[in-house]
Amino acid sequence: MLNDKQSVENIPRILISADRSSSGKTTISMGLMAALVSRGYKVQPFKVALDYIDPSYHTEITGRFCRNLDGYLMDENGILDVYTHACEAGEKADIAIIEGVRGLYEGFESLSDLGSTAQIAKILNCPVIFVINARSITRSSAALINGYRNFDPDVEIAGVILNNIGSRRHAKKAKEAIEYYTGVPVIGIVPRDPAMQISMRHLGLMPALEGRRRLGDGGFEARLRGIEEIINKGIDVDRFMEIAKSAKALKSPENSVFSSVSDPGAPRPKIGVALDEAFNFYYRDNIDLLNLAGAEIVYFSPVKDASLPEVDGLYIGGGYPELFAAELEANESMRQDIKKASAAGMPIYAECGGLMYLTEKISTGVPGKGTYHDASMPESTYSMVGALPGHTIMGQTRVVSYNIGTLNKDCLLGKKYNSFKGHEFHHSEIREIPEDAEFAITLSRGTGIKNGMDGLISGNTLGSYAHLHGVAYREFASSLVEAARNFRDSRVLP
């Protein structure tokens, strides 16, 4: 395990990438994390880019919160800051495993590595394990590795895992070709096996919380154990660890956003965070930053809880409210509590799925051009909170984009003219918005809610399609905590 005197900058680390999506990165990453945890290692997981779902599995497996690393939203110092904070949180990590996104070189631009997995590998001095979906290829896999190595010599491809292997002969030919033509060792052979598949959803994988609900704790754990068993049989885990130990030392971040700690003697406003099967898209760094800014976090479930807890503000993240719309509608007392809190001026911040929940109603299964949803949803309409105007329609469009926004007024996210980079990822749109509706965010990039505007507001309630990360937008936590503190103080004044 890690020597207590070893600094975070020298913790073994390794990045798992591939030539494209659907190569097996996620299940192989999960299996390797599980295998190392079973051997007693404290594994710190990371995910490149801004996905919420893969990290939910990494967190379940390792017992440590997975963190996102995004080279478009975050500068180099921000990436180092997130990495260092995560490895130091709780017990210091023994190894960091970073799962890439899409292909190794896919990113924001075609002529630079901005926002790519390769960019993260270079910033973190990380050796790369390259996963190849080897279905129907053998010798060609060597050409693939040579091409990826030569494309950017500053990215160290230190090992290969062959996935989707159909037979011993298939494995032998592909392994021999790669090692002969490239000199890169093949450290793993993963057979073609349905046990390596995780249920899909229209935004990617099924979140871990929902996986547990649908499979039951026993079935969910059995699925994860099955993946771990396949990885232990097919991959040289000791060699994987040796490669991770070869990572060069990192520099320390400067001016860490996590070093800003509120006055420990000051009263802590309580912020309710919605967390259940319907709402679970949160960056753990945001929760940490809210705590550091002085908030006490109180979790609650819009699906299961009959009433709001005693709080001074609400944070309702993204998720799949459309899949739990019947349960959310049935919990009328919770919907009424949230609407009353909004009317009373409580600061309520909602992102994407949270925004949808705060509108007047959600319609699912609506036929139309561009309909996109893998999940089977009946054609129906469900009443929601109604704290914000509008009717959420599912399935009419698919938006996946970074966005850039500017606050056009003071609000619970900060001061007028503050700007941010965020992202949006959804299959819904908000219709029937009144002409006089107010928006707090003007977008220079992205879709938003309507006509390039985002951040629909009513009083002190704000809902947006934009997802924010508190390391990229540093005013996020302090602004939301200040709004909650002001609301609490206004209620205790004589």
Curated annotation (Swiss-Prot):
The a and c carboxylates of cobyrinate and Ni-sirohydrochlorin are activated for nucleophilic attack via formation of a phosphorylated intermediate by ATP. CbiA catalyzes first the amidation of the c-carboxylate, and then that of the a-carboxylate. It comes from the Archaea. GO terms for molecular function: ATP binding; cobyrinic acid a,c-diamide synthase activity. It catalyses: cob(II)yrinate + 2 L-glutamine + 2 ATP + 2 H2O = cob(II)yrinate a,c diamide + 2 L-glutamate + 2 ADP + 2 phosphate + 2 H(+); Ni-sirohydrochlorin + 2 L-glutamine + 2 ATP + 2 H2O = Ni-sirohydrochlorin a,c-diamide + 2 L-glutamate + 2 ADP + 2 phosphate + 2 H(+). One of its GO terms (biological process) is methanogenesis. The keyword Ligase applies. Pathway: Cofactor biosynthesis; adenosylcobalamin biosynthesis; cob(II)yrinate a,c-diamide from sirohydrochlorin (anaerobic route): step 10/10. Belongs to the CobB/CbiA family. PANTHER family: COBYRINATE A,C-DIAMIDE SYNTHASE. Its EC number is 6.3.5.11, 6.3.5.12. Residues 270-475 form the GATase cobBQ-type domain. Comprises of two domains. The C-terminal domain contains the binding site for glutamine and catalyzes the hydrolysis of this substrate to glutamate and ammonia. The N-terminal domain is anticipated to bind ATP, and cobyrinate or Ni-sirohydrochlorin, and catalyzes the ultimate synthesis of the diamide product. The ammonia produced via the glutaminase domain is probably translocated to the adjacent domain via a molecular tunnel, where it reacts with an activated intermediate. Keywords: ATP-binding, Cobalamin biosynthesis, Glutamine amidotransferase, Ligase, Magnesium, Methanogenesis, Nucleotide-binding. This is Cobyrinate a,c-diamide synthase. CDD domains: CobB_N, GATase1_CobB. Pfam families: CbiA, GATase_3. PROSITE patterns: GATASE_COBBQ. Its cofactor is Mg(2+). Catalyzes the ATP-dependent amidation of the two carboxylate groups at positions a and c of cobyrinate, using either L-glutamine or ammonia as the nitrogen source (Potential). Involved in the biosynthesis of the unique nickel-containing tetrapyrrole coenzyme F430, the prosthetic group of methyl-coenzyme M reductase (MCR), which plays a key role in methanogenesis and anaerobic methane oxidation. Catalyzes the ATP-dependent amidation of the two carboxylate groups at positions a and c of Ni-sirohydrochlorin, using L-glutamine or ammonia as the nitrogen source. It is an enzyme of class 6 (ligase). The record marks H467 as: Increases nucleophilicity of active site Cys. The active site is at C352 (nucleophile).
